[in-house]
């Protein structure tokens, strides 16, 4: 699981916003490093702009992170297509539909 902070609000990490979807931003690490090395990839924990929010929000981030760590075995896993869904060229086989905004059919 990636745990990260951002310098901007959660609103800027939507697919049509300036920073783009957070899953797109993290895709190279999730897919190219963690999944490739055999890890189950857990939904990331993101604390948005902790330096610009009040102490009560920062405390909530810490509490939420603590809860996530204590219950990590039940944390949602990200979906990745199995290897057999890819051809020799490492592209999705014809008829296999991409399931994420990062993994697109072209």
Task: Go through each PLM region and give its residues.
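Short glycine-rich His-centered loop
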Residues: 6-10
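Glycine-rich phosphate/pyrophosphate-binding loop and the adjoining helix
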Residues: 11-106
